[in-house]
């Protein structure tokens, strides 16, 4: 076959004309050291703070230290197979996690991957874990309650939607129990819940998940897990990941509750990372920005205006406010609330529920200390009936504590003092409550009314809780319509007060306990 030079040249020209050169600009670097989950990289000239860096083993690292000649990054997973001299690539992206209603009822890790064996998750998209909190103009005042189901908290330390309420105390005093019951109580209120477990034993987390499932609350809850066996990086990032999942609901005009259990362990993980990155240590060896670590997280919990929701959803949702309520947990050592991290978080939050070992060991559970527990914004969100009836409870307990201390040294007490002591004992007994038994508004109102209006005067201290239980059962069966209405409205009026009196008088006249 004879080749025609003209045909060949035309063919070559056609091929050249069709050829498209694809150029890919990539920012590459070289690992210069690997130790304790920290990689130092040379050559990443255009790296951002918090940027994800692709590693040769398929994993990712997050850039945290941007130095003159190198980048210090923390590895998000296994790092044993990383070696000096290996190439890494910038991604130009910061860490994102899946968000959406598809995560409800699921247990996920910090990166949003399912770890419950129930298959893949159908998410509605992805959200960055670091988001700037809504500004002052975008916020709305807190005026709707979050009913925790704990009568001592809902009456004395009320929590509102969009509030940050710290739960603080030593180990093993019931901090997690309060948070879990608050989540269980939301299964009929329309609040979605996110439980973030940081640095806990896997067996403890499994128990919490089982309890949520057992009480029907898991289907409205997302559980984010960074257990004690996870790397410090994942424990440090878990609260931010959980917060982004909660913001999905807030920004679409819904209400969500997030529990961080606990932020002490997150601070320890961040301290570990900072020391490995050779950042200068400060008080208690924490880095200088440990306050910002928690403030930028907790400021994201807020109640946002309808205008903010409408703008975010581009008009799809109108006339609805959204909220994200945070219950951070802090563990103290020997009751020392003046330590570095506890004082930081106390100053950031809108109040604290302080649990003491002394109350817990004396059988008063939940072990809430009403003297130093406070809610700075929740009072305006409290429902009317609880607000009206709870006024005398804190006063009665404060007077009882003072008189009980005085009575130890006084041999002869007058009648008024004896009555106050007796009333204080009964109110203290009434504030006791079992775990996994959250109380509705109507149940709490009946209980508080009986104490406030003197219906416990002739009841022995040992029988106070039996009296309460029998009273609630009686009201549920004999006055079901009033009971349901009170649960729905939470109102208080002269007519409702009269109905309360009628229920209690009939109950005391006809029932035994």
UniProtKB/Swiss-Prot annotation:
UniProt catalytic activity: ATP + H2O + 4 H(+)(in) = ADP + phosphate + 5 H(+)(out)
Entry-linked Pfam families: ATP-synt_ab, ATP-synt_ab_C, ATP-synt_ab_N
Major location (coarse): membrane
Residues that coordinate or bind ATP: 169-176
Superkingdom of this protein's organism: Bacteria
PANTHER family in the cross-refs: ATP SYNTHASE SUBUNIT ALPHA, MITOCHONDRIAL
Subunit organization: F-type ATPases have 2 components, CF(1) - the catalytic core - and CF(0) - the membrane proton channel. CF(1) has five subunits: alpha(3), beta(3), gamma(1), delta(1), epsilon(1). CF(0) has three main subunits: a(1), b(2) and c(9-12). The alpha and beta chains form an alternating ring which encloses part of the gamma chain. CF(1) is attached to CF(0) by a central stalk formed by the gamma and epsilon chains, while a peripheral stalk is formed by the delta and b chains.
Family classification: Belongs to the ATPase alpha/beta chains family.
Protein name, as recorded: ATP synthase subunit alpha 2
UniProt source species: Psychromonas ingrahamii (strain DSM 17664 / CCUG 51855 / 37)
């Amino acid at each position: 076959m004879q080749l025609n030079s003209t045909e060949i040249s035309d063919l070559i020209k056609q091929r050249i004309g069709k050829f498209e050169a694809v150029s890919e600009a990539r920012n590459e670097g070289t690992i210069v050291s690997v130790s304790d989950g920290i990689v130092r990289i040379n050559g990443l000239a255009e790296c951002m703070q918090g940027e994800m860096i692709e590693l040769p083993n398929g994993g990712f690292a997050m850039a945290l230290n941007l130095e003159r000649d190198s980048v210090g990054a923390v590895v998000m997973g296994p790092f044993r197979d990383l070696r000096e001299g290996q190439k890494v690539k910038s991604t130009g992206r910061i860490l994102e996690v899946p968000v959406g209603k598809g995560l409800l009822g699921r247990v996920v890790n910090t990166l949003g991957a399912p770890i419950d064996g129930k298959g893949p998750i159908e998410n509605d998209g992805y959200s960055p874990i670091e988001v700037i909190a809504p500004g002052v103009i975008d916020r709305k005042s807190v005026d709707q309650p979050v009913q925790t189901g704990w009568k001592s908290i809902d009456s004395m330390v009320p929590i509102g939607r969009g509030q940050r309420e710290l739960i603080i105390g030593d180990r093993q005093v019931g901090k997690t129990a309060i948070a879990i019951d608050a989540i269980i109580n939301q299964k009929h209120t329309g609040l979605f819940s996110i439980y973030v477990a940081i640095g806990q034993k896997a067996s403890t987390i499994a128990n919490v998940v089982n309890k949520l499932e057992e009480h029907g609350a898991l289907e409205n809850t997302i559980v984010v897990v960074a257990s004690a066996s996870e790397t410090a990086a994942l424990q440090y990032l878990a609260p931010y990941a959980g917060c982004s999942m909660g913001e999905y609901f807030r920004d679409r005009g819904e209400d969500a509750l997030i529990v961080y259990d606990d932020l002490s362990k997150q601070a320890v993980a961040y301290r570990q990372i900072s020391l490995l990155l050779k950042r200068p240590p400060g008080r208690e060896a924490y880095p200088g920005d440990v306050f910002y670590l928690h403030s930028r997280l907790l400021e994201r919990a807020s109640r946002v205006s309808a205008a903010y929701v409408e703008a975010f959803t581009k008009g799809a949702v109108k006339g609805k406010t959204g909220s994200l309520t945070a219950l951070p947990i802090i563990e103290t050592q020997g009751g020392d609330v003046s330590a570095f991290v506890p004082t930081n978080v106390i100053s950031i939050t809108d109040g604290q529920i302080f649990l003491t070992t002394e109350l817990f060991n004396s059988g008063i559970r939940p072990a809430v200390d009403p003297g130093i527990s406070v809610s700075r914004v929740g009072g305006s969100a409290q429902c009317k009936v609880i607000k009206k009836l709870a006024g005398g409870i804190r006063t009665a307990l404060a007077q009882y504590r003072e008189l009980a201390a005085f009575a130890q040294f006084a041999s002869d007490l007058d009648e008024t003092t004896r009555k106050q002591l007796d009333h204080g004992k009964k109110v203290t007994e009434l504030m006791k409550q079992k775990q996994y038994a959250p109380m509705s508004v109507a149940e709490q109102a009946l209980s508080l009314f009986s104490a406030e209006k003197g219906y416990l005067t002739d009841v022995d201290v040992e029988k106070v809780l039996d009296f309460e239980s029998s009273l609630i059962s009686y009201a549920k069966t004999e006055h079901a319509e009033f009971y349901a209405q009170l649960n729905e409205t939470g109102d208080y009026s002269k007519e409702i007060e009269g109905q309360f009196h009628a229920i209690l008088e009939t109950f005391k006249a006809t029932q035994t306990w």
